[in-house]
Swiss-Prot record:
Compartment(s): Nucleus; Nucleus, Nucleolus; Cytoplasm
Keyword Cytoplasm assigned: yes
GO biological process assignments: cell differentiation; gene expression; telomere maintenance
InterPro entries associated with the record: Leu-rich_rpt, LRR-containing_regulator, LRR_dom_sf
Organism domain of life: Eukaryota
Chain intervals with Low complexity compositional bias: 16-32
Organism the protein comes from: Homo sapiens (Human)
The name this protein goes by in its record: Leucine-rich repeat-containing protein 34
Native organism taxonomy: Eukaryota, Metazoa, Chordata, Craniata, Vertebrata
LRR repeats: 295-315, 323-345
Gene it is expressed from: LRRC34
């Protein structure tokens, strides 16, 4: 059984002793809002928009003796203004603690307790981003309660909230019965192997969740293998992120199991396996599976230990695979030989790949120029990211020519040519497959699709 989260200030115990032992019990005021008739339920659902979310939040904080969080108050005021303008349908409430130029008071588990009481009746809010706050396991408990009550929520972002294995267990178990949530981000919460196993067990039951992000969650070998096993049967998950597990073996057992899964799963569209210690034998396992897989469109194997020998297998499978559209090979070591293998395939055989990232792969001019030549003959191949390699003059001229000829749009690459004293150089541009994976501004140029090209090219399910 998960550890009991501490009861926030102002919560008064009620109910049976068993219920009280398991979780914070309802206060009389909270219980009084539970509608007993359809008419009363409708009145509760309409309470927030009529009185205003900001006012409702202030009143609840006073009632529960909870300190008002000015950040939450400001965001709810913005939502109230949208409602007044008639923009109340399908709102994503953005209370992320890291997307403001001015420092904000981050949301704690106790703050989320009050917020969840408001949101459970807001049927026009279908997305919630509370990433980069201080929810901890207390907040995870109330997030689980919210998923029980709020049946319109399709997107929930809890990334980097210091949620541990116990909090992960609470979230995973409530998803056994939830049938509305489509996209869950748990990124950066150290739920570890124990929490990962609960999420894997959840996927045996849940048939509605489409995207699950468990990157940087300290998953263990056991849980990664469990996910690979479960996904041979789960037909709902379209995208899964298993980045940076804690692996102690050099045998690549997890990659072997993922390869077996890809042979049987024909629903998965995006697979992220960054920092899995994948070597050439591991990429061979994945490529062998891709001969039989007809659904995967986005493969992320960045930050691994793949060399030019591994590119032999990838280049070969790309000759016959017609579904892969985005491949992220960033921060490996494919060098000139690997780039040449890919270039030959993209020039003469493959007409389905749209985007390739070879950032920081120790590629020199020969390999980079070869890839640029592929873009001249392959009109489908439209996005390439090459920063962090060894540019010579021929490379700079080749990519400058690509952009000037219109074969490569400036937004579809991470370099920009400039001339000094008659010589062409390349500067870095902030575009990429997942440049703003950890943080995306809600305004300005960084919100353009070019900044997150991989996600724009391969949209999965409902977007937040």
């Amino acid at each position: 059984m998960a550890a009991q989260p501490p009861r926030p200030v102002g919560e008064r115990s009620m109910g049976s002793s068993r219920e009280a032992a398991r979780a914070p019990a309802r206060s009389p005021a909270w219980a009084s809002t539970q509608a007993s008739t359809p008419g009363a339920a409708l009145a509760v659902q309409r309470e927030s928009p009529e009185s205003g979310l900001q006012k409702h939040y202030s009143n609840l904080c006073m009632e529960k003796s909870q300190k008002i969080n000015p950040f939450i108050l400001h965001i709810l005021q913005e939502v109230d203004e949208e409602i007044k303008k008639g923009l109340a349908a399908g709102i994503t409430l953005n209370i992320a603690g890291n997307n403001r130029l001015v420092p904000v008071e981050r949301v704690t588990g106790e703050d989320f307790w009050i917020l969840s009481k408001i949101l459970k009746n807001c049927l026009y809010i279908n997305g919630l981003d509370v990433g980069y706050n201080l929810l901890c396991d207390v907040g995870a408990y109330y997030a689980a309660k919210l998923l029980q009550k709020q049946l319109n929520l399709i997107y929930l972002n809890l990334m980097f909230n210091d949620i541990g294995p116990e909090g992960g267990e609470l979230i995973a178990k409530v998803l056994h019965k939830n049938r509305t949530l489509k996209y869950l981000r748990m990124t950066g919460n150290k739920i570890e192997n124990k929490g990962g196993m609960f999420f894997a067990a959840m996927l045996q039951i849940n048939s509605s969740l489409e995207k699950l992000d468990l990157g940087d969650c300290d998953l263990g070998m056991q849980s990664v293998i469990a996910f690979a096993t479960v996904l041979t049967q789960n037909q709902a998950i379209k995208a899964i992120n298993l980045n940076r597990p804690i692996l102690y073996s050099e045998q690549e057992e997890s990659t072997v199991h993922v390869g077996r899964m890809l042979k049987e799963n024909h629903c998965l569209v995006a697979l992220h396996m960054c920092k899995h210690d994948i070597k050439n034998s591991g990429i061979q396992q994945l490529c062998d599976a891709l001969y039989l897989n007809s659904s995967l469109r986005y493969l992320d194997v960045s930050c691994n230990k793949i060399t030019h020998d591994g590119m032999v297998y990838l280049a070969d499978v790309l000759k016959s695979n017609t579904t892969l559209e985005v491949i992220d090979l960033s921060f490996n070591r494919i060098e000139n030989a690997g780039a040449n293998y890919l270039s030959e395939t993209l020039t003469s055989h493959n007409r389905s790949l749209k985007a390739l990232s070879v950032v920081s792969n120790n590629i020199e001019g020969e390999g980079l120029v070869a890839l640029s030549q592929s873009m001249k003959t392959n009109l489908t191949f439209s996005h390439i990211y090459i920063w962090g390699n060894k540019f010579d003059e021929a490379t700079c001229i080749a990519y400058s020519d690509l952009i000037q000829m219109g074969c490569l749009k400036p937004d579809n690459t991470d370099v920009e040519p400039f001339v000094v004293d008659g010589r062409v150089y390349l500067a870095e541009v902030s575009n990429g497959l997942k440049k703003h994976y950890y943080w995306t501004s809600t305004y300005g140029e960084s919100y353009d699709h070019s900044s997150n090209a991989g996600f724009a090219l391969v949209p999965v399910g409902q977007q937040p």
